Every structure is written in C-alpha cells, then in structure tokens.
Curated annotation (Swiss-Prot):
Biased composition (Low complexity): 232-243
Coiled coil regions in record: none
Subcellular location: Secreted, Extracellular space, Extracellular matrix
Disulfide bonds: C37-C96, C62-C68, C95-C104
GO cellular component terms listed in the entry, alphabetical order: collagen trimer; endoplasmic reticulum; extracellular matrix; extracellular region; Golgi apparatus
The protein, known as: EMI domain-containing protein 1
Positions of the UniProt region annotated as Disordered: 162-371, 405-441
UniProt PTM: O-fucosylated at Thr-42 within the EMI domain by FUT10/POFUT3 and FUT11/POFUT4.
EMI domain sequence ranges: 33-106
Amino acid sequence: MGGPRAWALLCLGLLLPGGGAAWSIGAAPFSGRRNWCSYVVTRTISCHVQNGTYLQRVLQNCPWPMSCPGSSYRTVVRPTYKVMYKIVTAREWRCCPGHSGVSCEEASSASLEPMWSGSTMRRMALRPTAFSGCLNCSKVSELTERLKVLEAKMTMLTVIEQPVPPTPATPEDPAPLWGPPPAQGSPGDGGLQDQVGAWGLPGPTGPKGDAGSRGPMGMRGPPGPQGPPGSPGRAGAVGTPGERGPPGPPGPPGPPGPPAPVGPPHARISQHGDPLLSNTFTETNNHWPQGPTGPPGPPGPMGPPGPPGPTGVPGSPGHIGPPGPTGPKGISGHPGEKGERGLRGEPGPQGSAGQRGEPGPKGDPGEKSHWGEGLHQLREALKILAERVLILETMIGLYEPELGSGAGPAGTGTPSLLRGKRGGHATNYRIVAPRSRDERG
C-alpha cells in the first residue's frame, strides 16, 4: 500500500536533525511537555459475573384483610454471581528518564540525553524466549507483554493509510535510502484544552447486592442421651377358645327316691296279667254284657330303684376309640409376674474361625477439590495463550531483520508496520486473566 513517495518522506524525516527525539509543536510555553513519556501500568480489578441460578423461597403476603391460618411460600429463580479478577492495562504519562519535578522540567546533572527510543523498547520485548513448560503465575506478565506487542502490530497493520501529498524532490527508487527505523518519541505538546481537569465528585453509592447463598450443611452431631423407658402397653386381645377336653368318668349312684303314689284300679290288673290272655275271669254279680275295653291309661311314675345287684364279671377291654375332634382354643390367661434373673452361665467354648466373607461393594467416588480443578483450568489457559502468542509471532514475522539494519536484503520486512499516525494515540487494550472465587449475590 505504501508507495515510493511515502518511503522517501520517511527517510527525509529521519535525516533531519532531532529526528530521533521527542515530537514537539514548537510553541515556547509548552516546550516542557516533550519530557513526558508514556508507561504501561497493570492493575487488578474485581467484578461480579453471573454464574448460574438458584431457587429461593419467598414468603407471600396474606391477600385477605383477616389473618390467614398458615403461611404460604413461592419459589423464585435468583441469579448467582461470582467475583472475577481482571488484569487491566492502562497508559500513564510520567517524566522521562533524567527529568523530574511537577512539570518534568528539572533534569539531573549526572544524566545525559536518553539514548533509547520507542522502537528500541519494543525491540527488547520482541526477543523470543524459550518456553520452559512450567505454567505458573510467573509467566503471566511475560505473556501479557508479548500479547500486547502483537496487538499493537495488528492495529498498525489494519490502519488505513491516508493520502500523502506529492513531493517532486523525492526519488523514485527507495532502495538507496537505507537507514535505521524511525524512532517514535513521546506525544507532542497539547493545547490548553488538553490540560487535565480537576477530579470530579465521587459518585453515589451503588445498590446493595443480593443476599449471599446458603452455606453448606454442617456435620452431623453426636447422638443424644438415652431417654426414659416408656409406659407399659395395653392388655392384648382375648384369644380364641381352646380345644374341648375328653369326657369325664361316670359319677356314683344317687340316693333312693321317695315312694311313688298308688295308681288307679286298672293298674292292679296288670300285675296278674290280662284276663283274656291268662285264661282267668273275674266273677261279677250283674249279668250285663261287658263293654269294650277302654284305652290304656297313662303310664305311672317310675318307682324307686331297687338295690344294686352283685358286681358282675368284668368284661373284656374295648377297642381304643378314635381321638375326638379338636376343641376350641381356650382364653389365654394373664401373663404371670416376671421371675428373678437367673445366674450367669459359664462361657461356652470358643468356636472355630468362620470363612472369609466376600468383599463389599465399591464405595462412591469422592468429590474433587475445587482448588485443584481451578488450578488445572488456569494451567490449560496459560498453555493455550502461550501457543497462540507463538503462532501470531510466527505469522506476523516479528523476528525478521528490520528494514535498514543490514541483516537482510533490501525490500524485506513489512512496510505497513510503520504506518502509525503522527501525533495519534494508540488504543488501550485490556488483557484479562480470570481468577475467580464463587460468591452468590
């Protein structure tokens, strides 16, 4: 994109006296501003970043004018926040080496004009260093500086070159105009409107953060003392009746009963038998014919039992009868009183050793430590950052010899690297290296 005229103007600017010094507008009242130099400072700030959500129980108010019998709750999804630490780089203006004071006008007597330039400082940071492979926090600053240089180079490559007015005295061939690269000095003197204003009033206090998350559950406490014995239980239900027992032996004979009353006259006929059957007739004085025999009368009461007869010959033993049916279960009685405790028995002989049991199931895996996981993620991030920095340096060609240094042929290097706008300010970039700890807001 750069033509021969642009290269010629650049070489003429280098040949002018004071070309490697700081830029200056030339105004006498602001000549002290050339002693100011820019420095890159790094700060670590904290910020809240949302990290998931959690459920929160919120008490609902009673919609009725009267008091409600119970409390009601509703579940609300609340965001969870954590604190992230960011490393922010900023540019500050301070006195150049050899100058001091409020306006950087006092020069030290023992110090001379500084011999370094902006390109020299960048050249010191562009030297590749051997990566040791130890991804710890000591390499963060080195990677940050290298990445910062890469971003500055990329910004210069993407800047659109503004048209340069034609200069008739410039040669067409830029090859003979070799020389050291131009040095970028400190920014030029600013006008009155560029003076730093007074600090403003502090801002209002921010809103109160959300309540923190609930802490982890505590450890289980020791078991409490044994309580007093409980009251005795109620009496049990009545059991089913028991089986029916066998029949008892016959009882002894009872005493003789009272004598029976005398029966009717026809009862005495039965003692001598029926006259028709026994061939006996009763003489009667009347000659009337005998009528039919009436129905028999009711049986008389049982007479007294006779005396017991002699004991008979004992009979042969009978066959054993089948067992009777099982009777219903009897009612269970009340439990008796608890007896006294017996004497302790002698210990028995020691038994033989049993067989070895099967191994138990494998336990659950333990929880991983949060510190180890975060350290591993930090190492992976540093490793990826180091690889990307090396790839970018290789693609841009930062380690090729500079134009005019004599280490390479003419025309090498990237001409558009030096297209920085004179008097312009470089864009501030921030490099973030997260280092978090969880917090709920």
